[in-house]
Amino acid sequence: MNTTVYALATPAGRSGVAVIRLSGGGAGGMLDALAGLPRPQPRMATLRALRDSGGSVMDRGLVLWFPGPGSFTGEDSAEFHVHGGPAVIDAVLSALDEAGAHPAEAGEFTRRAFENEKIDLTEAEGLADLIDAETEGQRVQALSQMSGSLRRLYDGWRDALITAMASIEGEIDFPDEADVPDALSHAAYEPLSELIGSMFEHLDDGRRGERIRIGFSIVLIGAPNAGKSSLLNCLARRDAAIVTDIPGTTRDIVEVQLTLGGFPVVISDTAGLREAVDAIEAEGVRRALDRAEHADLRIGVADARSDEELVDLEGRLTDGDLLVLNKLDLGLVSERDGAYRLSAKSGDGVEALEARIEQIVRDRLSVREMPALSRVRHRRAVETALEALSRCRDQLADAPELAGEDARLAVRALESLTGRVDVEDILDRVFSQFCIGK
């Protein structure tokens, strides 16, 4: 890239220190213009007076010089660590603008790092996730991805596939060689089968990586006035939902975001399940059932005194879901093995339920040996590669030309994951998620 760009890398507003980044072919000259000569030693913080084009001192701060290609972006880069007052920041940014630099777009520094092959697309996504991480589980997954865990996996698949493709192309180029078909079967079939198995394992992860990014979904369902909203407030430790004695108080979905076991969790309170009395309640019930259908975990909440509620609720729960008998403080009538007996009003018994929820979240989202798919685009690309590889393997003996074409389709799908091929629309989407200055 020919242009030199700048951006404030720290949050806007008043602060102790502000960091301003600069990258591009003109970074060295602009650093000299503001901080004077001699230029600082690479990657060594140096205290300098920063001057505008008229020679007036704007501030005294630390400057750093990162000559390319040994920088984050792969280009000549510099940083100015100045006092974080708005007037100081504006003065330095204006001086850089006057020197010929341009304001960076969102994610432009990271995009330049990608285009200069300092990072691949999965590592860029990992960096974005690390910046957004709010829980320990998100931090660990993002750091692993940023450090190249997915890149190494996908590049390994690609290399193995290209090796297998050499055998397929050999069959196509030398069809009259008597020993080629046997060599093809031996050299390509088994590696392709191993690749297919590895991809199946990668996909069959219960969407663990995506859940770590966006949150493990838990939905509270049950009849009106069963105490779902009270339980939500108890788990959230705040008044997130309105609680009254009037059945049907909750009409729309109320969400609360929590951290359990170091992982993000989204708990949803829903409308009570019953024959709706009006169109608004009917829509609330429809949304409740839809949210429950797509939840990672359903918690059925029933009044401990009502057998009728229990029978209806048990028909809506599946293996792995939890059943809560609420309002224990009013007297227990119904009994169910494995049910959690509690009073959401007083909090008695809620601790055991919370511990069980946390254990379920840990079990389903815990780190495993194979890196996790963290985005929908990853899953779709691997599914595309898997479908192409399956066709390729099935056609090895009878149609090697078609097998070769499917192998190339699989390679392209894998390369789209790391950004080896031209995927401009994907790049725009990924880098637009970054803040200015990153």
From Swiss-Prot:
Q: What is this protein called?
A: tRNA modification GTPase MnmE
Which sites bind GTP? 225-230, 244-250, 269-272
Domain TrmE-type G positions: 215-362
Q: How is the cofactor bound?
A: Binds 1 potassium ion per subunit.
State where K(+) binds.
Answer: 225, 244, 246, 249
**Predominant cellular place of this UniProt entry's protein:** cytoplasm
Q: Which InterPro entries match?
A: G_TrmE, GTP-bd, GTP-bd_TrmE_N, GTPase_MnmE, MnmE_dom2, MnmE_helical, P-loop_NTPase, Small_GTP-bd
Question: Quick check: keyword Kinase in the entry?
Answer: no
Q: Which cofactor does it need?
A: K(+)
Where (6S)-5-formyl-5,6,7,8-tetrahydrofolate binds, per the record, is at: 21, 79, 118, 438
Query: Which PANTHER family does this one have?
Result: TRNA MODIFICATION GTPASE GTPBP3, TRNA MODIFICATION GTPASE GTPBP3, MITOCHONDRIAL
Q: Which GO terms describe its molecular function?
A: GTP binding; GTPase activity; metal ion binding
Supply the SUPFAM superfamilies for this chain. P-loop containing nucleoside triphosphate hydrolases, TrmE connector domain
